[in-house]
Amino acid sequence: MTVTTEGRTIEGRPIGARPVPRLKQRYRDEIAPALREQFSYRNVMQIPGVVKVVVNMGVGDAARDAKLIDGAVRDLAAITGQKPAVRRAKKSIAQFKLREGMPIGAKVTLRGDRMWEFLDRLVTIALPRIRDFRGLSPKQFDGAGNYTFGVTEQSIFHEIDIDRIDRVRGMDITVVTTATTDDEGRALLRALGFPFREN
């Protein structure tokens, strides 16, 4: 560990600067150069990267019980470290007893360091805690290198206190990348540690 007060740095960082997330550093040092070599990119701007992660929790039952949305917002805030936006119904649907403006879900969009820290926790801690987990499907890309998958319960995240769960809630997680093809997106996410099944 290098500590100097003259140059005002600690371990090569300016004093007061936040440490670079572990996965972001790995992407810069190892993953990006490996992808450049694998796909023979001429320009560094062609190397695919992660733009944002969107975590969405639908609460259809909130139409009948408004308190349920509070639990979803609390869980999502604990998992992501960011205050979720409450999503409301855009139109009324009588069959679902849904009126326009009713809260039906919560959503968080993560960018920057929070995004990298969330992805790191997701692949190293949360996904391995899923019961009978055999890997993620490699086919759920959208054709443009973005990946969406579902998680059936929030308890896989260690930020959630199992004793305080009022009900099991699933969520959809979308990883938006700058990749132009599914193969590029798959290679990027696999390098980041996403455990894809071998089909």
Swiss-Prot record:
Alphabetic keyword roster: Ribonucleoprotein, Ribosomal protein, RNA-binding, rRNA-binding, tRNA-binding
GO MF annotations in UniProt: rRNA binding; structural constituent of ribosome; tRNA binding
Database matches in Gene3D superfamilies: 3.30.1440.10
Name of this chain's protein: Large ribosomal subunit protein uL5
Subunit structure: Part of the 50S ribosomal subunit; part of the 5S rRNA/L5/L18/L25 subcomplex. Contacts the 5S rRNA and the P site tRNA. Forms a bridge to the 30S subunit in the 70S ribosome.
NCBIfam families associated with the record: PRK00010.1 (NF000585)
GO biological process, alphabetically ordered: translation
Protein species of origin: Frankia casuarinae (strain DSM 45818 / CECT 9043 / HFP020203 / CcI3)
Entry GO terms, CC: ribonucleoprotein complex; ribosome
HAMAP family: Ribosomal_uL5_B
